[in-house]
C-alpha cells in the first residue's frame, strides 16, 4: 500500500521556523528518523522523501506551492499514484488549539485554514485524516497573519518540540493501527 503524509507550510528560508510551518517541521523529524532526504519535484511542486514504514511505501510530502495552493500538489500526487482520500494524512497548524496540543481528526471542515481549504477544493472531499498541531492565538494586537508567519518564543518552542516528538511516534502507531479511534484515544490531548 502507498500512503502520503503531507506537512503543510511555506517554502523558503524566510518561513523555515514559523508557526505556519509546523507541518513541515513534523515531516523533517520523521525524515530524520527514517534517514531519508527530501528532493524537489518540479512536476508535483513538492519536496518529497520516500520511505517504508511497517511495510507500507510512504511519501513524505511538503508542497512548495505556498500554503494557499497546497491542494495542487496533493491532488497531482494522488492522481499520479491512484490514491484516494483515505490514503493521505495531513499535518498542519491550528490557531484554536493551545501551543503544543495535538489532535488526530478523520474529517471535517477547513476551520478557516487556507491550506486545508485548498486540499478540499482540489481533491473534492473533506474526508481525509489530519493531525492538527496547536500554535495558539495571537497575543495582544498582533494580526493572525503576523502570528502564523512569526517564530516561536522559547517557551512555546519547547512545547512544540515536545509535541513533534510525540507525533513522530504517533505517526508510526497511526500507520500500524487499523482503528483510527484507538489512535485518537492514545494521542489526542
Swiss-Prot record:
<feature type="active site" description="Proton acceptor">
    <location>
        <position position="20"/>
    </location>
</feature>
<feature type="site" description="Discriminates between blocked and unblocked aminoacyl-tRNA">
    <location>
        <position position="10"/>
    </location>
</feature>
<feature type="binding site">
    <location>
        <position position="68"/>
    </location>
    <ligand>
        <name>tRNA</name>
    </ligand>
</feature>
<feature type="binding site">
    <location>
        <position position="114"/>
    </location>
    <ligand>
        <name>tRNA</name>
    </ligand>
</feature>
<dbReference type="InterPro" id="IPR018171">
    <property type="entry name" value="Pept_tRNA_hydro_CS"/>
</dbReference>
<dbReference type="GO" id="GO:0000049">
    <property type="term" value="F:tRNA binding"/>
</dbReference>
<dbReference type="GO" id="GO:0005737">
    <property type="term" value="C:cytoplasm"/>
</dbReference>
<feature type="binding site">
    <location>
        <position position="15"/>
    </location>
    <ligand>
        <name>tRNA</name>
    </ligand>
</feature>
<dbReference type="GO" id="GO:0004045">
    <property type="term" value="F:peptidyl-tRNA hydrolase activity"/>
</dbReference>
<comment type="function">
    <text>Catalyzes the release of premature peptidyl moieties from peptidyl-tRNA molecules trapped in stalled 50S ribosomal subunits, and thus maintains levels of free tRNAs and 50S ribosomes.</text>
</comment>
<keyword id="KW-0694">RNA-binding</keyword>
<comment type="subunit">
    <text>Monomer.</text>
</comment>
<dbReference type="InterPro" id="IPR036416">
    <property type="entry name" value="Pept_tRNA_hydro_sf"/>
</dbReference>
<dbReference type="Pfam" id="PF01195">
    <property type="entry name" value="Pept_tRNA_hydro"/>
</dbReference>
<comment type="similarity">
    <text>Belongs to the PTH family.</text>
</comment>
<keyword id="KW-0820">tRNA-binding</keyword>
<protein>
    <recommendedName>
        <fullName>Peptidyl-tRNA hydrolase</fullName>
        <ecNumber>3.1.1.29</ecNumber>
    </recommendedName>
</protein>
<keyword id="KW-0963">Cytoplasm</keyword>
<dbReference type="InterPro" id="IPR001328">
    <property type="entry name" value="Pept_tRNA_hydro"/>
</dbReference>
<feature type="binding site">
    <location>
        <position position="66"/>
    </location>
    <ligand>
        <name>tRNA</name>
    </ligand>
</feature>
<dbReference type="GO" id="GO:0072344">
    <property type="term" value="P:rescue of stalled ribosome"/>
</dbReference>
<keyword id="KW-0378">Hydrolase</keyword>
<feature type="site" description="Stabilizes the basic form of H active site to accept a proton">
    <location>
        <position position="93"/>
    </location>
</feature>
<dbReference type="GO" id="GO:0006515">
    <property type="term" value="P:protein quality control for misfolded or incompletely synthesized proteins"/>
</dbReference>
<comment type="function">
    <text>Hydrolyzes ribosome-free peptidyl-tRNAs (with 1 or more amino acids incorporated), which drop off the ribosome during protein synthesis, or as a result of ribosome stalling.</text>
</comment>
